[in-house]
């Protein structure tokens, strides 16, 4: 089949790039643990073996490819080769905090994609992006454009100089020619200015339209910030995005506008009063241009980055659409893995994109496609070839349900991106005994600046207002994980919180002491597990795999099970997230020792519990 707008195939031999990286070896902490067994990820897919083609597949399925004209410049076939090499330094946006620009290095090159690493941090925070992404910039861009650069951990801000850093560490900066002007819409209209107000869709909760501010402008893109919320909800979009609308759009279209968090009397929010009180201006309505519908339709085929395992791109089908999004299904996989993605996401591509850019394509598996080598451990999840890990890029593969991003136990976990900034400040928040409720609530500054406000997810805050009617209404273990383990900065999953929310009908107040509903009370824990009493969750979260195994070995009657935790590469954070089901059914540990281990985990979690007043006074959330 003739590919539309096909460019010549790009040569991206990752092995050659790895050979060039001898002098740019990553820090000791970034080294990936090696398994004794051969990783299943070394088995090539059917596509890699040359046994699969889009032309044949479309004929067999009697399917149609999504027309290449529907894809944006960032999604379609690239015009240039990927010239980045492993070890090159650059500046770029932290996907978890879109307002933050960081020192990055290229950790891996695959086709037209890059795995980027935050200098000074563990590789579990690495993320994937396209080589032509507008989120990455050459060394010195922040200084030139007057953006703050977040320097590597361990360096002083006032002492950091790019050229000195590169020279001292014998590093290479990415050449400026690799970063091209990517402004398809021309220069930004002067009508858009930083600090102006508008109404914007919350991409994490697309049913909500909220009061927002233009927090930054780069080329033809806006940084949307939701007033009085932390920057994890921010996002970049172009000026014609359907996600941004002029002030008054909700009122004109019969939609509910969500007022800023902490705004008095949010039901009677008035733009006139708000603009006057904040001494700000609205973006003129005339500068907003209506974008044409995205044009994607159900049953169209395309290639999509797998959000659960972002090093992979899979054959996919659109199964549903709405105004701004498409719902994708990975061919050959169960529909439980389907999810919604923005129609303008850089992670969706026309068919043939992988072939043109030299990126492996994960195709629908057949029984005879999966070849298992003698002595090779096999992931039990149907369709999974053992590539990737729930703990992120730190581990290249897995061979059990515990590490599998697709296993039922991990299906709702948001594992693709860890939040290094929240985890970095965790210890500071815990050690600050004067950290009062008022500090975690909104500061009532609605000027669009990134104040240090409540960083809990909106759905988690809503969970605090749930009334537990009975054990059948809410999974207490999951609710405990959301309310107690996560509020002060450990990883959380919005999808996980949402799942818990949807299991309850009544919304009122939640018990301020969820620990009382768990298998053992605190006093009983202290008596049965005296060695656990003085250890806090923040300490456990920093444990290595060996330290977790050593702790399990120290528990009476659990000595022989320590090797199981070592085999599964369970570190402190993973240990805190284990459930009783994980320990008994997945790790195959007998009930007696499993209960002792699980009750230790509960004890650690309880040490992280918020003060009663903070739990009971959950803030009102949007919607």
Swiss-Prot record:
Gene Ontology CC annotation, any one: nucleus
Keywords from the UniProt entry: Chromatin regulator, Metal-binding, Nucleus, Repeat, Transcription, Transcription regulation, Zinc, Zinc-finger
UniProt-annotated location(s): Nucleus
Annotated MBT repeat ranges: 52-152, 160-260, 269-364
Lineage: Eukaryota, Metazoa, Chordata, Craniata, Vertebrata
Biased segments, Basic and acidic residues type: 10-35
Residue ranges of the region described as Disordered: 1-44
Residues annotated as signal peptide: none
Zinc fingers (CCHHC-type) by residue: 370-414
Domain SAM: start-end pairs: 543-607
InterPro entries listed in its UniProt record: Mbt, PcG_chromatin_remod_factors, SAM, SAM/pointed_sf, Znf_C2H2C
GO MF, one annotated term: zinc ion binding
Key word Metal-binding present: yes
Pfam families: MBT, SAM_1, zf-C2HC
Alphabetical GO biological process terms: chromatin organization; negative regulation of DNA-templated transcription
PROSITE patterns per the UniProt record, alphabetical: MBT (PS51079), SAM_DOMAIN (PS50105), ZF_CCHHC (PS51802)
Domain of life assignment: Eukaryota
Residues that, per the record, bind Zn(2+): 379, 384, 398, 404
Protein name: Lethal(3)malignant brain tumor-like protein 4
Function: Putative Polycomb group (PcG) protein. PcG proteins maintain the transcriptionally repressive state of genes, probably via a modification of chromatin, rendering it heritably changed in its expressibility.
């Amino acid at each position: 089949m003739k590919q539309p707008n096909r460019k010549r195939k790009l040569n991206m031999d990752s092995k050659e790039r790895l050979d060039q990286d001898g002098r740019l070896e990553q820090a000791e902490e970034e080294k990936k643990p090696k398994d004794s067994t051969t990783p299943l990820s070394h088995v090539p897919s059917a596509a890699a073996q040359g046994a699969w083609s889009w032309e044949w597949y479309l004929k067999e399925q009697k399917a149609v490819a999504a027309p290449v004209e529907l894809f944006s410049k960032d999604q379609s076939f690239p015009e240039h080769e990927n010239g980045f090499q492993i070890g090159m330094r650059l500046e770029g946006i932290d996907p978890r905090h879109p307002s933050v620009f960081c020192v990055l290095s290229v950790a891996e090159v695959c086709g037209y994609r890059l795995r980027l690493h935050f200098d000074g941090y563990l590789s579990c925070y690495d993320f994937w992006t396209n080589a032509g992404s507008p989120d990455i910039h050459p060394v010195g861009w922040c200084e030139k454009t007057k953006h703050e650069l977040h320097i590597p951990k361990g360096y002083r801000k006032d002492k950091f100089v790019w050229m000195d850093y590169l020279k001292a560490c014998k590093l290479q900066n990415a050449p400026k020619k690799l970063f091209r002007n990517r402004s398809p819409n021309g220069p930004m209209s002067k009508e858009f200015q930083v600090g102006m107000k508008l109404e914007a869709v919350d991409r994490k909760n697309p049913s909500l339209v909220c009061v927002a501010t233009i927090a930054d402008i780069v080329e033809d893109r806006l940084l949307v910030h939701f007033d009085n919320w932390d920057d994890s909800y921010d996002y970049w979009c172009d000026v014609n995005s359907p996600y941004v609308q002029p002030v008054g759009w909700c009122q004109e279209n019969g939609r509910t506008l969500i007022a800023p968090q902490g705004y008095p009397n949010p039901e009677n929010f008035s733009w006139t009063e708000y603009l006057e009180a904040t001494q700000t201006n609205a973006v003129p309505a005339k500068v907003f241009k209506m974008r044409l519908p995205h044009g994607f339709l159900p049953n169209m085929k395309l290639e999509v980055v797998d959000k659960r395992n972002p090093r992979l791109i899979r054959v996919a089908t659109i199964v549903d659409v709405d105004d701004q999004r498409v719902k994708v299904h990975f061919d050959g996989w169960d529909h439980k893995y389907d999810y919604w993605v923005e129609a303008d996401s850089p992670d969706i591509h026309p068919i043939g994109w992988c072939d043109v850019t030299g990126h492996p394509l994960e195709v629908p598996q057949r029984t005879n496609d999966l070849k298992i080598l003698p002595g090779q451990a096999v992931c039990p999840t149907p369709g999974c070839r053992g590539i990737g890990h729930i703990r992120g890029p730190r581990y290249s593969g897995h061979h059990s349900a515990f590490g599998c991003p697709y296993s039922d136990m991990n299906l709702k976990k948001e594992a693709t991106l860890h939040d290094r900034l929240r985890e970095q400040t965790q210890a500071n928040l815990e050690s600050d005994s004067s950290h009062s409720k008022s500090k975690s609530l909104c500061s009532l500054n609605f000027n669009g600046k990134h104040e240090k406000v409540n960083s809990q997810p909106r759905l988690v805050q809503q969970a605090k207002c749930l009334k537990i009617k009975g054990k059948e209404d809410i999974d207490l273990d999951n609710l405990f994980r959301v309310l107690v383990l996560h509020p002060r900065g450990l990883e959380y999953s919005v999808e996980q919180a949402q799942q818990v929310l949807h299991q309850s009908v009544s919304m009122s107040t939640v018990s301020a002491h969820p620990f009382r509903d768990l298998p053992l009370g605190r006093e009983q824990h202290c008596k049965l597990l005296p060695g656990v009493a003085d250890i806090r969750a923040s300490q456990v979260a920093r444990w290595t795999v060996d330290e977790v195994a050593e702790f399990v070995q120290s528990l009476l009657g659990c000595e022989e099970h320590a090797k199981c935790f070592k085999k599964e590469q369970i570190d402190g954070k993973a240990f805190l997230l284990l459930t009783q089901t994980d320990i008994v059914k997945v790790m195959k540990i007998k009930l007696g020792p499993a209960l002792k281990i699980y009750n230790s985990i509960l004890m650690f979690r309880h040490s992280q519990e918020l003060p009663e007043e903070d739990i009971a006074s959950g803030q009102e959330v949007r919607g």
